[in-house]
Amino acid sequence: MHYELSEDNKRIRDIVRRVASEKVAPRAGEIDAKAEYPQDMFDLLKDLGLFTLPFDEKYGGMNSILSACIAIEEFGRVCYNTAYLLVVQWVPFGAILAGGSKDQKDRYLPGLADGSLRGAFSTTESQSGSDVGGITTRAVKVDGGYQI
C-alpha cells in the first residue's frame, strides 16, 4: 500500500528526524548501557507534543496515525527505547478508545495525549512469557466486578 505524505506529515517527519539526530542519537548508547528509564526522552517527546499525534482532536490530539508511524520510524532509526516510549504511551489509547466508556475516554485520553498521564501495559505470564497468544489469564464478569 502506498501513502502520499501530506505537507503536515513531511513537516513532522523533518522535525522528528532532526530531533532524533541532534538530541536522541547522542544519548542512545548511554540509554542502552544504563538500562534505566529515559525520563529526559519522555520529557522531550512530551515537550514536542509528539504524544498527541494519533489522538483524536477532541482529546487534544492531531488525529494523524501516519504521523505517529513516521515518528516511531524516525526515532527507531537511532534509539529503539525512545521510539518505544511513544508505543507504550499509545497502547492504552487504543484500548480505551475501542472499549472504554465515555467517562473513561474523557478522563484518560487527554492526559495520555499531553503526557500528563503515563501509558502502560502488561502482557507477561510465567508460562507464556510475552506471547500474547499463549496467555491463559481471563477476566470473567461476576457480581460486583471481574474475577481474574
Language-model features: locations:
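Intrinsic disorder at enzyme termini
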Residues: M1-D8
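Conserved acidic
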Residues: D8, I12, Y37
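Short secondary-structure junction/hinge motifs that connect adjacent elements
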Residues: R27-L48
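Glycine-rich, Trp-frequent "lid" loop and neighboring beta-strands that shape
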Residues: G60-M62, D103-I148
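N-terminal capping segment at the start of a domain
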Residues: R18-G29
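Internal helix-loop-helix
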Residues: D47-S116
